[in-house]
């Protein structure tokens, strides 16, 4: 890292800290030549590849905006939505990929949204998964009920931690 003061090509890291949300690292550096200190902030880029093939930077705001529609009229606060968006970003970043499909972002939203509000989850899933009939809704509701029952009795069928997969016919 070049010193911004004397342009010396090297510097020593004095202190490193991760930001509160874990998306960046703040490093305090010192130049061995002039002795001055400076701060750098390192972030990783995360791009979302849309169906059209266009890549855009990941945006928590877009996650919140999409989920907010499903949560209209529900007891879900803005803080809840912000936390959900943070969890989604953490899940995606944990994969280590620099680019992720928009479909994967949608899948990452479903789990935390289901925990937050089941009605909002059904609304979001109905649009995201393209429910086209009452049977699609019934299957989703049945899966939610089965999951709730398994949470009450973890040994019911040994799959309490197994993800619920909904299939739709289009």
From Swiss-Prot:
UniProt keyword annotations, A-Z: ATP-binding, DNA-binding, Metal-binding, Nucleotide-binding, Repressor, Transcription, Transcription regulation, Zinc, Zinc-finger
Domain of life from the UniProt record: Bacteria
Cofactor note: Binds 1 zinc ion.
InterPro entries: ATP-cone_dom, NrdR-like_N, RNR_NrdR-like
CC cofactor: Zn(2+)
Region feature (Disordered): 148-170
A GO biological process held by the record: negative regulation of DNA-templated transcription
Domain ATP-cone: 46-136
Entry similarity comment: Belongs to the NrdR family.
Listed NCBIfam families: transcriptional regulator NrdR (TIGR00244)
Its job: Negatively regulates transcription of bacterial ribonucleotide reductase nrd genes and operons by binding to NrdR-boxes.
Protein name from the UniProt record: Transcriptional repressor NrdR
